[in-house]
């Protein structure tokens, strides 16, 4: 069970890094293109916000479970 949680946290960490790199690239592209926003970028932004929200919720749940196991009471 611990190995599974460890791998989930690892994937969460990698996903966070990938999202930050994508945001940096998009920021650089906007500076070059005069900050034009297309429908595709809007959809991508909605998807990224949804993924970020889900990742925050998963992290919160994992931290709550970890806190329960450490303190011994839930």
Swiss-Prot record:
One matching Pfam family: FSAP_sig_propep
Disulfide bonds: 68-74
Alphabetized UniProt keyword annotations: Amphibian defense peptide, Antimicrobial, Cleavage on pair of basic residues, Disulfide bond, Secreted, Signal
Keyword Magnesium on entry: no
Predominant place of localization: secreted
Signal sequence annotation: 1-22
Tissue specificity of this protein: Expressed by the skin glands.
Record-level GO BP terms: defense response
Domain of life from the UniProt record: Eukaryota
Protein location: Secreted
Residues of the propeptide: 23-42
Record's GO cellular component terms: extracellular region
InterPro entries recorded: Antimicrobial_frog_2, Frog_antimicrobial_propeptide
Family membership: Belongs to the frog skin active peptide (FSAP) family. Brevinin subfamily.
Role, per record: Antimicrobial peptide.
Protein name: Pelophylaxin-2
